[in-house]
Amino acid sequence: SQLTITDSEVGSSKIYCEVRRGESLWIKEIPDCKGDIVHPTVILTQTSSEEITSSRFATVVCSIIDFHPEAITVNWLKDGHPMESGFVTSPACETNGNFSATSRLTVPAREWFTNTVYTCQVSHQAATQSRNITGSPDSSECNHPAIKLLPPSIEQVLLEATVTLTCVVSNAPYGVNVSWTQEQKPLKSEIAVQPGEDPDSVISTVDISTQAWLSEAVFYCVVSHQDLPTPLRDSIHKEAWKDLREPSVSVLLPPAEEISAERFLSLTCLVRGFSPREIFVKWTVNDKSVNPGNYKNTEVMAENDKSSFFIYSLLSIAAEEWASGASYSCVVGHEAIPLKIINRTVNKSSGKPSFVNISLALLDTVNSCQ
C-alpha cells in the first residue's frame, strides 16, 4: 500500500499504517519524515570570455548542492524551450548524509554571445528551482576578431619596386584564415603567423608592386573562420592628395662654443612646409647610413596653417669625428620632391650646409658637395 501526501502535510499529524487479516489487526506508526527532505542549493557558473574565445565553446556548470533524498531531475532550457542535447548530468554523490550533483552544458561560442537565455531547471521532491544565465553581447564585442590594416612605409614606397601591406587580426580564434584580394582577384600572401608577444593576434602580409599601390587600387584583407557567420573584410588604398607641398630642409650646425667644449655634438635637421604628412628622415656619414639609435626624430606635427607639417631630427656625434672632417647628410624622402629624395650635407668646413637633389638610382652613392 502507498500513500502520497503533500510537502505541507508532512509532520502536521501522525500517520499510521493499519493492516487487517481476518480477526487480526496490526497498526504501525510511520516515523515523521519531515527532517529527511532537504532541498538543494542551485548555483550556475560559466567559463571566462577568454576561454570561450580560445576553445570556441562556452561551458555552463549547474551545481546542485546538499539535497536529500537522492532522487532529482535536471533539465536545461534554451529561451524557455527544453533542450534535448548538449548537456551531461553526473550521478549524485553522498557526503555527510546529503547528496550533490552537477550538470554541465556546452554551447558553441558563435551561439553563446547572442543574448540567448539558458536555464538550469532542478526538480526535487515536487519542488522546482530554476537558474538563468545569458551570454552578454557586450562581452562578445570585445572578443570578436578585429582587423587593422597597415600601409607600406613611405621609405619603401619611394625607394623600392614592391611594397608590403600588413593585416593585423586581434582576438583571432584558433585556426583563423586570412587572405588578400585586389578588388575580386585573389593575391598570394604570406601565411598568417601569431607573434609571440600577443597570442590572440595573427599577422598576414602581402607584397604588391609600388605602381599598383600608387594607382590607388583597393586591396582587401579577408578573415574567415567556422565560428564567424560571414567573413570579415577591410580595405586599404593609397589616398589621393591634391595639395602636394615640397619640404624645405635645413641643417643647423653646432654652436662654436659647443664644438670647443663638448665631447659630443648635435646636428639638427629641420624639415618643414610639406604635405601630406608621410615622410622619412634619416642620416648618413660619409655616404654610409647612420645607426637609427644615434638620432631621434620627433613626431610629424602640423604647422600653424594646419595644411602643412614639420619634423625635427637630432643627430648626436662624437666631437672628434666632426673634427676629422667627416661629412654628415640629412636625407629626406617625400612624394612632393621631384626626384623623391633631398639631401643636405655639412662638415666642419661648411659655412652653410650644401644642397643636393638626388635620384633614387643614386641614393646609395650620395656624393658630398664641397
UniProtKB/Swiss-Prot annotation:
List keywords of the entry alphabetically: Glycoprotein, Immunoglobulin domain, Repeat
Q: Does Disulfide bond count among this protein's keywords?
A: no
Q: Which domain of life is it from?
A: Eukaryota
Q: Which residues are glycosylated?
A: N98, N132, N177, N343, N347, N357
Cite the Ig-like domain residue spans from the record: 40-134, 145-237, 247-347
> Per its UniProt record, what SMART domains does this chain match?
IGc1
Q: What is this protein called?
A: Ig heavy chain C region
Species this chain originates from: Heterodontus francisci (Horn shark)
